[in-house]
Amino acid sequence: MNHIYIIEDDSVLCSELALALEAVGYHTTCANDFNNLLNEFLLVSPDLVILDINLPNTDGFILCMKIRKVSQVPIIFITGRDSQIDELQALSLGGDDYITKPYSLPVLM
């Protein structure tokens, strides 16, 4: 697993996360086209997805369901939403893990 697709609409946070992951040997791609995330996912063909819930034009729950229809790639939700209901929903829709912001990079790694 070396290619990680980061779907985070906060460009600063996405860049910081990408740099941290690249520093330990991962290749990363930050989402660019929030109108066509599924198509971008298919083009990127990642080994892992890091997915926020609150996104422009969609939400991470819906995108997770769409990804699950075409791929079994691991999906880690990283979000500021810390309710147990959101965590349960994320995992029941196909997410593999759920981490709340602010998060610790060692925990993520």
Please name every model-derived segment.
Residues M1-M109:
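N-terminal/domain-start alpha-helical segments
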